Amino acid sequence: LKKRLVDKGILSLIQQWLTAPVKLPDGKLIASTKGSPQGGVISPLLSNIYLHAFDKIVNNPQGKFTKANIRIVRYADDFLLMGKYYFSREILSYIHRIMENMGLTLNRDKTKLLHSCRSSLFYLGFEFRNIKSKFGWNTKNYTNVRPSMKSRSKLYAKLRELLAKRRHWTIEWIVWKVNQLLIGWLNYFSISKVTHIWETIKVIKKHLDYKLFKWMKSKGRKAHRKLRQRPYENLVKFYGLLDIEKYARLKTLAKAQ
């Protein structure tokens, strides 16, 4: 970092961050001797500073990556390189050498070579896959982008955990907690280029409707019988539950502008 930062005050602050002990859930403190804790707020910042040198190598107009017409997409220490498949093994070996020179190693479990026409690509919670579609006599390829099954499963698990054994909670409190969860998820995944977000939202609505029905039934109150007929729609109408289709449409339009 000293090669890229000249402000001694900032360097001192980063040094304190890196050497501060890590506090575990049980209250114990563990000394930090190397690296940054997983999920720490400073980790993405340090990754961006340190890997800026790698970005410059990849984007060098006269460099090996540019000559092979390879592009990079990077988020912190998680990156994709896209280009012609026949360059892939040569480029991968080159990346290994670059990382070694930087004192880093690639995660072999996460490092893969994929042909976009044959395999789905999973990145930052999204699934990218190549789809063939017929337009008249012609068959064209296009990229299908949608929230991955893993991302959807995580949302379902959080909803299940939220609604399980919460009989004592009021409807207003449940609506508030569910809205928090849905807004966070939709803010991330509602992007104009996500081609199948609406199909995903329909599935989420059905899942949420079923979970709300089970929760209301578990409370066993007569006052909830009418609400149980169409729990999702009724809670949207009478209790302010988020209309996820309407919200996603507004977010998609806002991000497209």
Regions found by a protein language model. Name each.
Residues L1-D109, L113-S116, S120:
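Conserved polymerase palm-domain catalytic core
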Residues L18, K23, E172-Y188, K206, ...:
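Core structural elements
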Residues T19, M102-H168, L181:
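A conserved non-catalytic segment of reverse transcriptases
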Residues I30-S36, Y142-N144, R160-I174, L186-E199:
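Short, solvent-exposed helix-loop connector elements
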Residues I72-Y75, T111-S119, K177-L181, W198-H207, ...:
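A glycine-rich phosphate-binding loop feature that marks nucleotide/adenosyl-phosphate handling sites
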Residues S192-K217:
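Short secondary-structure subsegments characteristic of cysteine-rich extracellular domains
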Residues I204-H207, M216-Q257:
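Extended C-terminal regions of large enzymes
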